[in-house]
């Protein structure tokens, strides 16, 4: 079974979000199950030179784009036993950021065409083409509409994964007409047209044989208007081919027993070592080294989606508790400034690191007691899974993947691995934070809760099995 992942980012090459983690980890897990996965992505100038040097030129072809043919170099390399193809074109991919350019519609139209034009030259017979998010959605659409009659392509099945419905790849109609050479028959509401523009994600949803969302709850949510980003009707129409498969984490990267970034490695049976990470974290940030004061942390993009309006509303009330708070992330300036002001107002309790630091993030996960993630919506979420693996108990809102992976602690049965609240309401969140703090001070209960969190399986194992089953069903 041969699978080709078409992605716009992938660890360890480039990363801007969770898509890169999925593209980096899932193929390795599928390989353990006997599924051959190869990955194709753009050869961005942002890829570290060391990784680019590990690739060789496999082939040079021309890619038809509108009225011209564009150069396409196919570079081939290997990382961790997985074969990668990098699509080389400096005009489109020698940029200072992955996305956000005036010509993104053209850049990813080119990449979509390049993926399809490369397939006959890859020394690899593709059984299933698996595209991800808006950037490669048109690969599946173009395959069905323009390439399926070609004997080289007619057997290929398609899967499309929605990582975040909010970002859809909406561009002017000229992109469809001039670059992809699709006619008027595609510019209507049953096809690519979307409020006067063209929507790439819509193409992926319509044309793919199977669609997955990155958690079962998110799969249900996106069929409702509140979460549906104006595509809920389309998703309801195609819900027969829509499924939800929760993401995992790469346990070779996120594992407190082997993590080289943290001060002291530990497992569920050596939690006294976790407390060394807490002291090291307090020391790093200049916080008082209080063992019995819980550290509440957030490692997050500072955006509205992450529920920061709730945090902002009741932050001072949280500060009335005996807690310390650490925020690591960057994003909208209004949230950055708010947390910087709180750090100024509460110098003995609040510390903020604006930006991202991989090593520090690992230390925050290992050294904190509670991890706050009150998202407005969360397709899957990575932070809560990492926190659980490190025995840092998550406080989450019951949405998307948070609802699927965090079971609220039940004092009657002793079951659960975290704390959760249902409504997007600041005082519901505050009540849940206070409840978590209360149990933190009940040491036997807390130790049991931490052990329950750490002994569950958050790896890609179960997810990879589900994807293998999905691929297999397409080939029967």
UniProtKB/Swiss-Prot annotation:
Molecular-function GO terms, alphabetical: alpha-1,4-glucan glucosyltransferase (ADP-glucose donor) activity; alpha-1,4-glucan glucosyltransferase (UDP-glucose donor) activity
EC number, as in UniProt: 2.4.1.21
Record has Lipid biosynthesis as a keyword: no
InterPro entries referenced in this protein's UniProt entry, alphabetically: Glyco_trans_1, GS/SS, Starch_synth_cat_dom
Origin: domain of life: Bacteria
Keyword annotations of the record: Glycogen biosynthesis, Glycosyltransferase, Transferase
Reaction equation(s) it catalyzes: [(1->4)-alpha-D-glucosyl](n) + ADP-alpha-D-glucose = [(1->4)-alpha-D-glucosyl](n+1) + ADP + H(+)
GO biological processes: glycogen biosynthetic process
Entry similarity comment: Belongs to the glycosyltransferase 1 family. Bacterial/plant glycogen synthase subfamily.
Function: Synthesizes alpha-1,4-glucan chains using ADP-glucose.
Name of protein: Glycogen synthase
């Amino acid at each position: 079974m041969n699978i080709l992942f078409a992605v716009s980012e992938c660890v360890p090459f480039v990363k801007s979000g969770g898509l890169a983690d999925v593209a980096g980890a899932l193929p390795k897990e599928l390989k353990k199950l006997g599924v051959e996965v190869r990955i194709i992505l753009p050869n961005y100038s942002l890829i570290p030179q060391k990784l680019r040097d590990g690739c060789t030129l496999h082939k040079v072809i021309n890619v038809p784009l509108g009225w011209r043919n564009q150069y396409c170099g196919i570079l081939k390399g290997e990382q961790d036993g997985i074969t990668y193809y990098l699509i080389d074109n400096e005009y489109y991919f020698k940029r200072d950021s992955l996305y956000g350019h005036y010509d993104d519609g053209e850049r990813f139209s080119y990449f979509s065409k390049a993926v399809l034009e490369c397939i006959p030259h890859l020394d690899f017979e593709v059984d299933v083409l698996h595209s991800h998010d808006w950037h490669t959605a048109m690969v599946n659409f173009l395959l069905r509409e323009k390439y399926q009659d070609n004997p080289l392509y007619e057997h290929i099945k398609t899967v499309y994964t929605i990582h975040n419905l909010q970002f859809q790849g909406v561009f002017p109609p000229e992109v469809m007409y001039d670059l992809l050479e699709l006619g008027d028959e595609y510019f209507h509401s049953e096809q690519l047209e979307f409020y006067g523009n063209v929507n790439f994600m819509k193409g992926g949803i319509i044309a793919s044989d199977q669609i997955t969302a990155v958690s079962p709850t998110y799969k249900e949510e996106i069929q409702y208007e509140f979460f549906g980003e104006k595509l809920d009707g389309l998703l309801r129409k195609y819900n027969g081919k829509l499924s939800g498969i929760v993401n995992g984490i790469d346990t070779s990267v996120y594992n407190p027993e082997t993590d080289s970034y943290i001060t002291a490695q530990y497992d569920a049976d050596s939690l006294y070592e976790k407390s060394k990470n807490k002291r090291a974290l307090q020391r790093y940030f200049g916080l008082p080294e209080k063992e019995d004061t819980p550290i509440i942390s957030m490692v997050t993009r500072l955006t509205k989606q992450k529920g920061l309006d709730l945090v902002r509303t009741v932050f001072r009330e949280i500060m009335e508790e005996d807690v310390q708070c650490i925020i690591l992330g960057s994003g909208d300036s209004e949230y950055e400034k708010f947390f910087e002001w709180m750090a100024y107002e509460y110098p003995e309790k609040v510390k903020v690191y604006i930006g991202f630091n991989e090593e520090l993030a690992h230390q925050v996960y290992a050294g904190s007691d509670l991890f706050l993630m009150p998202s407005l919506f969360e397709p899957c979420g990575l932070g809560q899974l990492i926190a659980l693996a490190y025995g840092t108990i998550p406080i989450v809102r019951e949405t998307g993947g948070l609802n699927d992976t965090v079971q609220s602690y039940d004092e009657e049965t002793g079951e659960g691995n975290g704390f959760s609240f249902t409504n997007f309401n600041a005082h519901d969140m505050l009540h849940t934070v206070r409840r978590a703090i209360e149990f933190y001070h009940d040491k036997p209960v807390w130790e049991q809760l931490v052990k329950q969190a750490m002994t569950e399986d958050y790896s890609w194992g179960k997810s990879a099995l589900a994807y293998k089953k999905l691929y297999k069903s397409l080939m029967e």
